[in-house]
Amino acid sequence: MNYLFKNGRYMNEEGKIVATDLLVQDGKIAKVAENITADNAEVIDVNGKLIAPGLVDVHVHLREPGGEHKETIETGTLAAAKGGFTTICAMPNTRPVPDCREHMEDLQKRIEEKAHVNVLPYGAITVRQAGSEMTDFETLKELGAFAFTDDGVGVQDANMMLAAMKRAAKLDMAVVAHCEENTLINKGCVHEGKFSEKHGLNGIPSVCESVHIARDILLAEAADCHYHVCHVSTKGSVRVIRDAKRAGIKVTAEVTPHHLVLCEDDIPSADPNFKMNPPLRGKEDHAALIEGLLDGTIDMIATDHAPHTAEEKAQGIERAPFGITGFETAFPLLYTNLVKKGVITLEQLIQFLTEKPADTFGLEAGRLKEGRAADITIIDLEQEEEIDPTTFLSKGKNTPFAGWKCQGWPVMTIVGGKIAWQKESALV
């Protein structure tokens, strides 16, 4: 099916929001211009809505294989499509881990059969993510690994991390890191700060993250490797990443929507839906994350979509697993709380969710360019809705944002020229 989207707006190559039509033919973007006509295409009048590149998320947890009670590739990618994401990168903390040919081939087969959006799987750095034996990077790259990470646990052994970075550099691949110094975690379930003290909870100190990032940055410099930092959350982390970039070290970084919107002061009680890793930090940390995003220290926004069951989250804040679901709330949360409040511009938000992650990892995505795959999201910037977890397509309903009123909701998502999801009656 060919589609002609009429009367939309998009961000052009100069970074300006302008009027446009967009023609999709044979799964590709055929033309982006005003006043397009086409005889062999279904016309969809988007009536002034935003025509955006499909959103790109480099940090997601689909749970399959091994955690299908939390999420599956099918439910997770449907949720991604509903959130406007057309390319997502799946973390390897599954069971089994994609750490060898057999496991990666099985994962790729599942993706091919079940995914509703483009899914790029990470390869594990170490076998079973146990930290003691490196995987075969060459084989995992051959089988389509997006990059290498032991996300969820991090690589504690510096010698192992250096060896991994050297091997990844030879393959022109990135090493992506969840940064925690295990000896500093202190069995914490929240940030070590006012909230942990008030509720008598073990806290995770900020230095737990920043000291690990500092170590890895020096290792990356020694290995001449592209090193990407997951979910930055502290002022100290922003500082060391900024200094590393100024020194010319190949480091990039991401921040989550929840760390941009919330801090520990926003936690109403010991609610497990506010438990994520890294935890919500203090006001100064939150301000540093915004500053880092604006000055280029932090390159992109990634959801860290981490679904869990209601039963798991009901165990209380100390026993419940870390993580919140993120696909279906990311854009409206960021648009409402950052763009509408003048913290960043709409153009910047689009870049942080599309071209910045795509360019950082060399993906042919994130831009509405003629000849590229038609990965497109239509967003109604005027639509206001209340976040209702019962409507999520994700199996995970675990969100701290239930009841929040937000504007800027995706209404249609196109992947490879096919409609992957659309809001009923939104474009008729």
UniProtKB/Swiss-Prot annotation:
Gene3D superfamilies reported for this sequence: Metal-dependent hydrolases, Urease, subunit C, domain 1
Cofactors required: Zn(2+)
Catalytic activity: (S)-dihydroorotate + H2O = N-carbamoyl-L-aspartate + H(+)
Pathway in which this enzyme or protein is active: Pyrimidine metabolism; UMP biosynthesis via de novo pathway; (S)-dihydroorotate from bicarbonate: step 3/3
One GO cellular component term noted in the UniProt record for this chain: cytoplasm
The protein's enzyme class: hydrolase
Entry's cofactor comment: Binds 2 Zn(2+) ions per subunit.
Molecular functions per Gene Ontology: allantoinase activity; dihydroorotase activity; zinc ion binding
Keyword hit for Plastid: no
Binding site for substrate: H61, L62, R63, N93, N277, H308, F322, G323
EC number(s) given by UniProt: 3.5.2.3
Entries under InterPro entries matching the protein: Amidohydro-rel, DHOase, DHOase/Allantoinase_Hydrolase, Dihydroorotase_CS, Metal-dep_hydrolase_composite, Metal_Hydrolase
Entry keyword set: Hydrolase, Metal-binding, Pyrimidine biosynthesis, Zinc
Protein residues bound to Zn(2+) 2: D151, H178, H231
Keyword Signal carried by entry: no
Family statement drawn from the similarity comment of this UniProt entry: Belongs to the metallo-dependent hydrolases superfamily. DHOase family. Class I DHOase subfamily.
PANTHER family from the UniProt entry: ALLANTOINASE
Name of this protein: Dihydroorotase
UniProt source species: Bacillus cereus (strain B4264)
The encoding gene: pyrC
